[in-house]
Amino acid sequence: MQGLNADEVLRLLRSLIPGELATGRGQRGDPPEAQDLCADSRLDAEPIRADSLDRLNLASALNRFFRLHETGVEDRLLAVRRIGDMAELIADASQHTSGLTFSTSGSTGTPQPHHHSWAALTQEAEALANALGSHPRVIAWLPVHHLYGFVFGVALPRALGSTVIESHAAPTALFREPAPDDLIATVPARWRYLFDSNHRFPGGTGISSTAALETACRNGLLQAGLDALLEVYGATEAGGIGLRWAPSEDYRLLPHWHGDATATSSALNPDGAAVTVAPLDRLQWRDERVFRPTGRIDDIIQIGGVNVSPGHVARRLESHEAVAACAVRSHGEGSRRRLKAFIVPARSDADPETLRQTLENWIWEHLPAVERPTDLRIGTELPRNAMGKLQ
C-alpha cells in the first residue's frame, strides 16, 4: 500500500468529518451523519454547513491525519468545497506521503499523534489477511479514522481484495443481508449488542479489537452461527501486536514482532526501520512468541472500546465549583462497564438531590459518553479503607 484511492479517502472523510465538526463545534448544533455524506456533498451546504472557522479547523485536522504537509498541497484544502473533489485531492497527494497520523482516543489527556507508515500498515494488513483467509466482503462496523478501523476497514479489505460495507450500513448488512463468508470487524461493545440481540449468523468470521471479549459473549456468538472470532491485541502507538482465536489461548505475536519480558519490538518496514514499544499492560510471556496480558500498568480502563482514565474524569468533576473532592471508579464488567463517582460537595449545606441534578446536567453537556458516570453518590468525605486508600 502506497497511498489511497479516492473511494478509500471518501470512506475516511465520512468517518472523519462528523467527529471533527463535533469537536470543533462543541454543543453548537449536531454534526452530519456519515450516511448523509457523499461525493457531491458540499462543506458550505446542508447537511455539513461549515462556516469559515469550521472549514479552517477541518482543514487542519485533515492535513494532520493525511500528512499533506509532506506534499505542499495542504493550503488547497481551504479552497475546496465539494467532498468528492477533496477526496481526489487527498488521494493524489497520498501517493507522495509517508503514511497516516492516528491519534490516541479517550480521557488520557491531549490526544497523542502516532505516525504509521504505508509500509507498516501494509505489513499488518497482509499478516491479518494471511491469518483470516479469503473473504469476499468485509463488514467494517467501526470508525475507520481510528487505527484499528483503518486497518480492518481499509487496509485489510485491500489486502484481501474484498468489497467493504461501511460502518453506517453495517447493521442493515448484518441483520437483513448476511452472507456465510462475511468478515465482520467491530469492537466488543457491538459484539455484545449482537449477542444480547440474539442475532443469528449464517456463518462468517469475526475480528475484534480494543479490549478482550467476555468469554460468555464470545461463546454465545459462536453458538449463534459465527464460524470463528479473532481477537487482536495492540495499541494506537504500535498497531496490532498479537492474535488469538479463543480466550483460553494466549496471544501469539504477528510475524514481524519480537518480544521479551520488558518490551516488544519489531522491524516494521521492509527498509529495516525498527520500533520499540514499552507495553501498556503487564505481559506474562510463555516464550518469545506467546504472551498473555494480566492488567494495565496505569489506571486506564476500557469503556465502549475507548481508553478512559478514572483519575482524569475525577479531575474534570473537581473543576466544577460545587465539587470539593471526587473519586471515580468503574462498575460492571466487559462491554457493560461504566463509571461511578463519589462527590464531596464544596458547601456543607448543599442539598444532595439538587447537587446531583446539577452535576448530571453538567456531565451530559461537558463529558463524552464513555466518561460520564452513570451513578453519582454524595457524601461528606471520600470513602477510604483501613489503609487510607480510596475505595
From Swiss-Prot:
Gene3D superfamilies: 3.30.300.30, N-terminal domain of ligase-like. It catalyses: (E)-4-coumarate + ATP + CoA = (E)-4-coumaroyl-CoA + AMP + diphosphate. One of its GO terms (biological process) is phenylpropanoid metabolic process. One of its GO terms (molecular function) is ATP binding. The keyword 4Fe-4S does not apply. Keywords: ATP-binding, Ligase, Nucleotide-binding, Phenylpropanoid metabolism. Pfam families: AMP-binding (PF00501), AMP-binding_C (PF13193). It comes from the Bacteria. The keyword Lipoprotein does not apply. Converts p-coumaric acid into p-coumaryl CoA. This is necessary for the activation of the photoactive yellow protein (PYP) chromophore. This is 4-coumarate--CoA ligase. It comes from Halorhodospira halophila (Ectothiorhodospira halophila). The gene is pcl.
